Each structure stands twice: as C-alpha cells, then as structure tokens.
C-alpha cells in the first residue's frame, strides 16, 4: 500500500485529504482511494505509475473519456483521477464534483489555443478532431492508437457472444473511424476461434483480389506531388504503412481505406455468423406456451444474421412474424390487420401464454365442455321414448302428485294395506320374493324352501353302508312337480336334494 500511495507526499497529501467525496458530505479522500484507483487501472491495462504526475493523469483521462457512459465504477475512477490531477496542478477544489468541471474548462481552453495557433500560421481550416486521426498544433495529421479499453471491450464481446449476430454492430461501433492498422490490431487480439478467423482472412483476400481487378495499378512512375492508388493489400494494411493510410484518408478527395477494409471485415463476419447460427428465419416458430415477446426476440436475432436486403427483411417481418406465431397469437395478430406496428402487436399479445391467459383459456374450455354435456343430456331426455312414469299419491290414491304434497287428511296406518301398527316400508302384504312368488304364501313355506318335508327331531341313524342310494318316494314325486313351476329352483339348478 505504501508503494502505491507514494504518488502524494507532503503538502499534496494534505490537500488530497481535505477534498470531500460528495458535495456537503463528511467523508474525505484518503490513501485507500489512491490504492483503489491503481488497482482499477490494472484492469484496463493502464500503467499505474501515470498517477504520479499531472501529465500521466491527463493521459489516463483521455483513455477513459470515451467510456464515461459505462459503469458506475468507471465514472468513479475518472472522477478520482481528475481530482488527483487537480492536486498535482494545485487547483483548489472542495469536492469530487468540482474536479471534472475544472478539467473540462482546461480542455476547452487548450483546444481554443490550438485552433488560434493554427489560424495564426495561415491555416484557416478548423483543426480536425476526427478520431483516431487528428491534427496537431503544427497542422500535421497524427494518429492516436486504439485505446486498451476498446480492445478489452472487443475481446470480451467475442468471448461472451462468440459470433452471434450482435457481434457485428459491436465491431462497427468500436471501429468507427479506424485505420486498417487499427482494424488489424482488433482482429489480432482475438485468441480463440481460429477457424472463424481463417474464414475471415479468406474473405478479405477474395475482396482484395476483386479490388485489384476493378482498380488496376497505374503503370509507370508516379508524378511528383501525387500519391499512388492503394491496392487490395494496401487497403488490408499488409503492404502499406500507417503514414500512407493517413495520407489516403486525409487527401482531397479522400480514399477511405479504413471504411473499405471495414466493409470487407463485416462481410466476412456475416459469413461467420451464418455458420455459427445455422438456424434459418423460416425455422423460428412460436411455441404453444412461449410468450410473444420471447418469440419476437428470437425472430429478430435470427433476422440480423440473414444475408438479405432491407426490403426482403421487411417482407419477412410482415409475413413470417405473423405466420409462424402460435394459434392464439395468430388469431389476435390477424384481427389487427396487415398495417399493425410491432408495438401494437406486442401490446395485443401481452400476457398470451402466461398464467392468467392459461386460466382464462381453461375456464372457457370447461364452460364449453359443461355446456356441451348439458346439451347432450337434454337431447337424451328429449329423445327418450320409454313409458312415462305415473306419479301416484299413497295418501289419497290419486295420480298427479306425491304424498308430501297431498292436501287430503293424512291417512293413519300403512298406506299399502291400511292396517295400523306399521309403516309402508315394513308392510309384508303381497311382497314377492326374487322368484316372483308372493310371500308369505298361503300354502305354507316360501317357494325357495323345500315343501312338505318333515323336520327331523333327532339326528339320523348312522349308516355304515357304502355306496347306498336312497330311492325317492314315488308318491312324493308328483307333488314336487306341482309345487315347483318352471321358475322354481329345480328348474334353475336341477334336482333338489
């Protein structure tokens, strides 16, 4: 900690510890904040020793300036370095908020001085600030190397996303205004995916050969004061120097070798993305339970990888987005009409596939099923052509109503036989057994018992005869025939014992 905190000593350290972290706050800067800043610089591949001087702080702020829209930690690092710069320059600031404001004022004043110096030298053109090629105070076009932050961001995108469709716009944004040398630096930082990089090199070589075919080199010596025309390998940065690239890009008329080379790289990246994303836009279909928003995200992600013109992509969006939706969303989208915007589609299909939509669909299905079942029951009742049941009152004996609704005086006793002492459910009058015979019978025992059989009063005599058969009585046989009709047990089970 002591080695990293040695950037300040004596009066500078006292001034550092008087600056507040927030406007009106109690906490102030300490040595630990310098230690934290040095650690963060290591993450961005910047030299920690730059914190020891004001010029080093300026160089750090130039590298961090394009990334101020990043994370909170990155903004805190920039503000800490700006505060440290004010301490080195002995600029009095009360808190962290005043330090970036002072740095911004100094930058504006320096730019005005550079422009004024250029005008005094007879150059009426404004100073070019097109990064990475800028014009210095002497009017010379100089190149600023690509920042480590840009390279780090590009490497992270390739590592995390591989070669998904969003890599192409990220590369285009990070390489804005870059020279062929800067573009080659970005490509060389990619460690893995060498098969993809070889495909990219093949595409670049093909485009360079096509450029040489369309733009043949001028024969003979080049007139003095003119620059040679770039070849395909010059545009790719293999046979041209950085100064030649700057002259081509800043000449009048300019030859944008950086933009041409960038188009070649993007063309190769499109081929790689198509290889890494083999799914066709025709195969993107919404699942039965997939939310419409997730389906749209997958659709447009695959659409970005398609090699087609903007008109064709517009037709795909208008046609396939609705055609490949699930039946629920397709019904809603077709009801909106062909001129519906994506926002209207997203709003109309919001909630389709979610719990509330599932519950609503289930309730509708159950109501339809119950309605169909009720209709079937009514049809069965209406089509039933059996004998109509006659309702008869047990109290008065009339038809058309039940006994509980009868207005006549309540009859005493059994409603079936008229006798008192028991109820109708206990009445045995004219009760038939399972053979259909009225029970109790006036002829004695019920029909399902043996008739005219004397009950033994003592155990039967022991019989020691084997194989003896008892001959049936010839006199009893006709009586049994009379007692047992066709519905008797004898007719069902054969001879009774």
Curated annotation (Swiss-Prot):
This chain's protein is named: Gag polyprotein
Q: Where is this motif: PTAP/PSAP motif?
A: 456-459
User: Ranges of Polar residues compositional bias?
Assistant: 108-126
Query: What more does the record tell us?
Result: HIV-1 lineages are divided in three main groups, M (for Major), O (for Outlier), and N (for New, or Non-M, Non-O). The vast majority of strains found worldwide belong to the group M. Group O seems to be endemic to and largely confined to Cameroon and neighboring countries in West Central Africa, where these viruses represent a small minority of HIV-1 strains. The group N is represented by a limited number of isolates from Cameroonian persons. The group M is further subdivided in 9 clades or subtypes (A to D, F to H, J and K).
Q: Which organism is it from?
A: Human immunodeficiency virus type 1 group M subtype G (isolate 92NG083) (HIV-1)
* Region of interest (Interaction with membrane phosphatidylinositol 4,5-bisphosphate and RNA), residue spans: 14-33
Q: Does the keyword RNA-binding apply?
A: yes
- Which biological processes are named by the entry's GO terms? viral budding via host ESCRT complex; viral translational frameshifting
In this chain, the stretch annotated as Disordered covers 107-126, 440-497
Q: Which PROSITE patterns match?
A: ZF_CCHC
- Residues with Phosphoserine modification: 147
Which residues are annotated as modified residue Asymmetric dimethylarginine in the UniProt record? 388, 410
Domain comment?
Answer: Late-budding domains (L domains) are short sequence motifs essential for viral particle budding. They recruit proteins of the host ESCRT machinery (Endosomal Sorting Complex Required for Transport) or ESCRT-associated proteins. p6-gag contains two L domains: a PTAP/PSAP motif, which interacts with the UEV domain of TSG101 and a LYPX(n)L motif which interacts with PDCD6IP/AIP1.
Pfam families in the cross-refs: Gag_p17 (PF00540), Gag_p24_C (PF19317), Gag_p6 (PF08705), zf-CCHC (PF00098)
Q: Where are the zinc fingers (CCHC-type)?
A: 391-408, 412-429
PANTHER family, A to Z:
ENDOGENOUS RETROVIRUS GROUP K MEMBER 24 GAG POLYPROTEIN-RELATED, PTHR40389:SF4
Which segments carry the region annotation Interaction with host PPIA/CYPA and NUP153? 188-226
Q: State a single Gene Ontology molecular function.
A: zinc ion binding
Residues carrying the site annotation Cleavage: 131-132, 362-363, 378-379, 433-434, 449-450
What stretch of residues is annotated with the motif Nuclear localization signal?
26-32
Where is the segment annotated Interaction with host AP3D1?
A: 12-19
- Reported modifications of this chain: Gag-Pol polyprotein: Specific enzymatic cleavages by the viral protease yield mature proteins. Capsid protein p24 is phosphorylated possibly by host MAPK1; this phosphorylation is necessary for Pin1-mediated virion uncoating.
Positions of the UniProt region annotated as Interaction with membrane phosphatidylinositol 4,5-bisphosphate: 72-76
Q: Which GO terms describe its cellular component?
A: host cell nucleus; host cell plasma membrane; host multivesicular body; membrane; viral nucleocapsid; virion membrane
């Amino acid at each position: 900690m002591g080695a990293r905190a040695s950037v300040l000593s004596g009066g500078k350290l006292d001034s550092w510890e008087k600056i507040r972290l927030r406007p009106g706050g109690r906490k102030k800067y300490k040595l630990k904040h310098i230690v934290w800043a040095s650690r963060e610089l290591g993450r961005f591949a910047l030299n920690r020793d730059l914190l020891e001087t004001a010029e080093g702080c300026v160089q750090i702020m130039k590298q961090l300036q394009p990334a101020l829209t990043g994370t909170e930690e990155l903004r805190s690092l920039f503000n800490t370095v700006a505060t440290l710069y004010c301490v080195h320059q002995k600029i009095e600031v009360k808190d962290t908020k005043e330090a970036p404001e002072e740095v911004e004022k100094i930058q504006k004043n320096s730019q005005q001085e550079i422009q004024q110096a250029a005008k005094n030298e007879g150059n009426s053109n404004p100073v070019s600030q097109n990064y990475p090629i800028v014009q210095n105070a002497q009017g010379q076009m100089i190149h600023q190397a690509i920042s480590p932050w840009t390279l780090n961001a590009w490497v992270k995108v390739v590592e995390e996303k591989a070669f998904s469709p969003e890599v192409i716009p990220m590369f285009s944004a990070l390489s804005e205004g870059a020279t062929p040398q800067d573009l080659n630096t970005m490509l060389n930082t990619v460690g893995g995916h060498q098969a993809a990089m070889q495909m990219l090199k093949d595409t670049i070589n093909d485009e360079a050969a096509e450029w040489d075919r369309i733009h043949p080199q001028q024969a003979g010596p080049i007139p003095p004061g003119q620059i040679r025309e770039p070849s395909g390998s010059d545009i790719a940065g293999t046979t041209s120097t950085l100064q030649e690239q700057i002259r081509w890009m800043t000449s009048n008329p300019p030859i944008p070798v950086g933009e041409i080379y960038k188009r070649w790289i993007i063309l190769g990246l499109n081929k790689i993305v198509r290889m890494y994303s083999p799914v066709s836009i025709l195969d993107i279909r919404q699942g039965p339970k997939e939310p419409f928003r997730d389906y749209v995200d997958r659709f447009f992600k695959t659409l970005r990888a398609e090699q087609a013109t903007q008109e064709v992509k517009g037709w795909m969006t208008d046609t396939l987005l609705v055609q490949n939706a699930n039946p629920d969303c397709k019904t809603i989208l077709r009801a909106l009409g062909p001129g519906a915007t994506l926002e209207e589609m997203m709003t109309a299909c919001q909630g389709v596939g979610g719990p509330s939509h599932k519950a609503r669909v289930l309730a509708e299905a159950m109501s339809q099923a119950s309605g169909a079942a009720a209709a079937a029951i009514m049809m069965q009742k209406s089509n039933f052509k059996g004998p109509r049941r006659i309702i008869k009152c047990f109290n008065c004996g009339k038809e058309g109503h039940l006994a509980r609704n009868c207005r006549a005086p309540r009859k005493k006793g059994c409603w079936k036989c008229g006798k008192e002492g028991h109820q109708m459910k206990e009445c045995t009058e004219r009760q038939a057994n399972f053979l259909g015979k009225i029970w109790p019978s006036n002829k004695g025992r019920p029909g399902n018992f043996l008739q005219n059989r004397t009950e033994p009063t003592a155990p039967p005599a022991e019989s020691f005869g084997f194989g003896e058969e008892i001959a049936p009585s010839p006199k009893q046989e006709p009586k049994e025939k009379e007692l047992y009709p066709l519905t008797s047990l004898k007719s069902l089970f054969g001879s009774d014992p």
